[in-house]
Amino acid sequence: MKKILSTLTLTTALVSANVIADIRIGLDSAPYPPFSETNASGELVGWEVEIGAALCEAMGETCEVVPVAWDGIIPALLAKKIDAIVGSMSITEERMKTIAFSDKYYNTPAALVAAKSADIDGSPDSVKGKIIGVQVSTTHQNYAQAYFESMADSIKTYQNFDEHNQDLASGRIDAVVGDSLAFEGFLTSDAGKDFEIKASLNDEAIFGPGVGAGIRKEDTELLARFNAAIAQIRADGTYQKISDKYFDFDIYGD
């Protein structure tokens, strides 16, 4: 595995693969800014990378970040290839049948994005005959299937967030469903300048109460330590200090 140090300030908690780590943290191998991405120097950077490092430091553990394809990340956890998922995974009842979750560490709404000129408002009728893009194995896919599938031409799945944004920009699909915050990079780019958020999408039964760390059900001690670490970095200001570098609002949510 290639070296994936985040930044020099994080090396006390995140290590490269040639060092034996106490905890292996899995996240999506595809870029997902501002949460995680690889910079020009080959370093893994982003808000969630820094939060993961802070949690490891709070637990007094050395952690290795292991990039995993999103649709294989829960199987990797169950197969003990990783020990925890700190990768923007929503806490849902369906996933909790298979794995356990820590307390939430952030919560942002989902959104429907389409061309500024498109007459789409987030209602099922407004996507009639449209092709909707979603990342596979996500709550966004579940929402699109529940609310839009009966009216849309089709729901097209993609392996990662960037792929459906590229197809949207090229006109191969009409709209995409994803995390509202993750769309910011696309919407402020040249490729995304003609697109906008058409609607915020809410359904707690689908999206859950927020994002938590995914843990194997039997690892109850590790789960308790993650919960304690989340509470600690929230209380001591570390969480806010990291968040202020990326956001001008409270990402923790309600």
Question: What are these model-predicted stretches?
Answer:
Residues 72-75, 89-97, 143-146, 174-207:
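A ligand-binding cleft/hinge motif common to bilobed small-molecule-binding domains
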Residues 57-58, 66-67, 71-83, 98-100, ...:
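Short helices/loops that flank or line small-molecule/ion binding pockets
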Residues 35-40, 52-61, 140-159, 165, ...:
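Ligand-binding cleft/hinge of the Venus flytrap
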Residues 22-88, 97, 236, 249:
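Extracytoplasmic small-molecule ligand-binding "clamshell" domains
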Residues 29-30, 107-114, 188-228, 247-254:
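Periplasmic-binding protein-like
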Residues 62-64, 140-156, 194-197, 227-254:
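Ligand-binding clefts/hinges and TM-proximal coupling segments of bilobed small-molecule sensing domains
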Residues 49-58, 118, 125-126, 130-131, ...:
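Extended ligand-binding regions for polar small-molecule ligands
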Residues 61-64, 90, 103-152:
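A conserved helix-loop-strand patch within extracytoplasmic ligand-binding domains
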